[in-house]
């Protein structure tokens, strides 16, 4: 089963499988009942009132000292906790406090025996540090740490400390009387010095005031001279500036007249230029504009006629080629139909083909020239060389017809010229 303890307590588990014993400060531990044993030890801080009655000091004067010490078993240090468990396990807090108290009192007595009453009385910090240092080194071996030690009280039964106080009081009173007399003396001296310094300061002040008055009058006279000089210079400068200003005004007036005259000349020149531009705009520019307009109109009309003629010629050419293609298609159809005729004309072979082509050529020529018969107007554009007029039209038509055998050859694969020049074969 589990056992727990707070941070101010430690548990020691011994017995089966617990060698050495397990020590747990502020936690929990598992204990097997009956075969393992658990014991607890307190880690609380203990306050000890350490009294040493009638202890003889180094000079043999018996005094009594009371100190306050705070001690506790150190649970964070495993070695000190183990030492404390070995010495105090199973003991109560009172028993542990008694052991620590006896140890501290012994060390306190030892320190008192090595110091005088005056040292203990006047330097309590030194006494406390020595007791703390010596007692700590001894109690550490028991697992106890000294948290703090403070000297609380010192007294004796022989009025030794009281006598020390009386002597000190008398000395203080003596020093006070001496100090009072010296203070009165010093006060008188300082008062006399103060009066002397006051008179000296008054005289010095009057001297300084006289010097200041003299310096003021001298500076005022110099200032008046400078002011009058500056005033005269200012008057002369003003008159000179007035003369310069009048001269500048006259120069500016002359310059204004020159500028006005120059502006009049510029205005006249601008008027002349304006009249010239007006004349040019009224006479020259309209003539040039009209000439330019006529030139542009002529060029536009020329371009329009050229483009119109090219468009019409292209239209005629494309219609002719389209109709020729249609005729060629019909010719191929008829050629297939005439294949049987060709078998009947085995004796004539090429002659039969030539006969059929020649039979259809008038129809082809008629279809090609047909669009020309429906044209209302033919516009011819000449580049300056070649035929003109009707001869030009005739030449164009003949040119189209001259390309007819070539077109037939591309469409049918039969060359009219070659067939015409071959001799007829008989069966």
UniProtKB/Swiss-Prot annotation:
InterPro entries: Band_7 (IPR001107), Band_7/SPFH_dom_sf (IPR036013), Flotillin_C (IPR031905), Flotillin_fam (IPR027705). Its main location: membrane. The modification Phosphoserine is found at residues 19, 163, 385. The keyword Membrane applies. The keyword Zinc-finger does not apply. One of its GO terms (molecular function) is protease binding. Belongs to the band 7/mec-2 family. Flotillin subfamily. May act as a scaffolding protein within caveolar membranes, functionally participating in formation of caveolae or caveolae-like vesicles. This is Flotillin-1. The lineage of its organism: Eukaryota, Metazoa, Chordata, Craniata, Vertebrata. The gene is FLOT1.
